[in-house]
């Protein structure tokens, strides 16, 4: 799922995704975080 977190690198999304999905899985796509 795309979340409303801006990013440059995928590792910026891991903590944000952990809060949302409970998993450290995500990547930066079009400067926005996508969680798995």
From Swiss-Prot:
Site (Aromatic residue of the functional dyad): 36
Keyword list, A-Z: Calcium-activated potassium channel impairing toxin, Disulfide bond, Ion channel impairing toxin, Neurotoxin, Potassium channel impairing toxin, Secreted, Toxin
GO molecular function, one term: ion channel inhibitor activity
Protein's cellular compartments: Secreted
InterPro entries membership: Scorpion_toxin-like_sf, Scorpion_toxinS_K_inh
Disulfide bonds: 7-28, 13-33, 17-35
Residues marked Basic residue of the functional dyad (site): 27
Tissue: Expressed by the venom gland.
A GO term from the CC aspect: extracellular region
The family this protein is said to belong to: Belongs to the short scorpion toxin superfamily. Potassium channel inhibitor family. Alpha-KTx 16 subfamily.
Entry comment, domain topic: Has the structural arrangement of an alpha-helix connected to antiparallel beta-sheets by disulfide bonds (CS-alpha/beta).
Function (record text): Blocks calcium-activated potassium channels.
Protein name in the entry: Potassium channel toxin alpha-KTx 16.1
Organism annotation: Hottentotta tamulus (Eastern Indian scorpion)
Lineage: Eukaryota, Metazoa, Ecdysozoa, Arthropoda, Chelicerata
């Amino acid at each position: 799922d795309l979340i409303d977190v801006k990013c440059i690198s995928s590792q910026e999304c891991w903590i944000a995704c952990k809060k949302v999905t409970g998993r450290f899985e995500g990547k930066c796509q079009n400067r926005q975080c996508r969680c798995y």
